[in-house]
């Protein structure tokens, strides 16, 4: 049986070295012993001999329950996966002639999204003759930029794409 890292640590008869540094089931260092002695000690207490540090000279082995070790490793991996946050891009849509109160509501939402660690894409949609007043849209995005400058940085500067002007901001 060949050992691959995804199988987990080598255990019992899979350990193919003549001598190992042994740590018993109570965590006490037993010194360097032969593999046969280590296997006998593990069998005595009804546990497995597991290679903990394979790169050491001689390798470090511990007498523990292999099933319990695998369970703890899986649990640790699941915990780290749970703690990782996927950064999403939230979108806030506005018009160039947005009212003061509406702007305040949108700004609050931007602050909330940034506080949650997400990126925010602010989109200004121009309709009809509003395209002639792109400078108003640029001023509005500059205002958003200034109002969020203490908590966010600009990831992509305001740019015009078709009838929309957009800008992306992210937490500092």
UniProtKB/Swiss-Prot annotation:
<keyword id="KW-0396">Initiation factor</keyword>
<dbReference type="Pfam" id="PF00707">
    <property type="entry name" value="IF3_C"/>
</dbReference>
<keyword id="KW-0963">Cytoplasm</keyword>
<dbReference type="GO" id="GO:0032790">
    <property type="term" value="P:ribosome disassembly"/>
</dbReference>
<dbReference type="GO" id="GO:0016020">
    <property type="term" value="C:membrane"/>
</dbReference>
<dbReference type="Pfam" id="PF05198">
    <property type="entry name" value="IF3_N"/>
</dbReference>
<keyword id="KW-0648">Protein biosynthesis</keyword>
<dbReference type="GO" id="GO:0003743">
    <property type="term" value="F:translation initiation factor activity"/>
</dbReference>
<dbReference type="InterPro" id="IPR019815">
    <property type="entry name" value="Translation_initiation_fac_3_C"/>
</dbReference>
<comment type="function">
    <text>IF-3 binds to the 30S ribosomal subunit and shifts the equilibrium between 70S ribosomes and their 50S and 30S subunits in favor of the free subunits, thus enhancing the availability of 30S subunits on which protein synthesis initiation begins.</text>
</comment>
<dbReference type="InterPro" id="IPR036787">
    <property type="entry name" value="T_IF-3_N_sf"/>
</dbReference>
<dbReference type="InterPro" id="IPR001288">
    <property type="entry name" value="Translation_initiation_fac_3"/>
</dbReference>
<dbReference type="GO" id="GO:0005829">
    <property type="term" value="C:cytosol"/>
</dbReference>
<protein>
    <recommendedName>
        <fullName>Translation initiation factor IF-3</fullName>
    </recommendedName>
</protein>
<comment type="similarity">
    <text>Belongs to the IF-3 family.</text>
</comment>
<dbReference type="InterPro" id="IPR019814">
    <property type="entry name" value="Translation_initiation_fac_3_N"/>
</dbReference>
<dbReference type="GO" id="GO:0043022">
    <property type="term" value="F:ribosome binding"/>
</dbReference>
<comment type="subunit">
    <text>Monomer.</text>
</comment>
<dbReference type="InterPro" id="IPR036788">
    <property type="entry name" value="T_IF-3_C_sf"/>
</dbReference>
């Amino acid at each position: 049986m060949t050992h691959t890292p995804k199988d987990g640590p080598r255990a019992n008869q899979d350990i193919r070295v003549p001598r190992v540094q042994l740590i018993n089931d109570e965590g006490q260092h037993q010194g360097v012993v032969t593999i046969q002695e280590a296997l006998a000690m593990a069998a005595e207490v009804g546990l497995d001999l597991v290679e903990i540090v394979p790169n050491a000279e001689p390798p470090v082995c511990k007498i523990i329950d292999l099933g319990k070790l695998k369970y703890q490793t899986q649990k640790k991996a699941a915990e780290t996966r749970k703690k990782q946050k996927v950064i999403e891009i939230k979108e806030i849509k506005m018009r160039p002639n947005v009212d003061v109160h509406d702007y305040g509501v949108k700004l609050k939402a931007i602050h909330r999204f940034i506080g949650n660690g997400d990126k925010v894409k602010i989109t200004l949609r121009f309709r009809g003759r509003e395209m002639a007043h792109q400078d108003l849209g640029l001023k509005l995005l500059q205002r958003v930029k200034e109002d969020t400058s203490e908590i966010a940085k600009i990831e992509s500067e305001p740019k015009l794409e078709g009838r929309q002007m957009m800008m992306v901001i992210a937490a500092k």
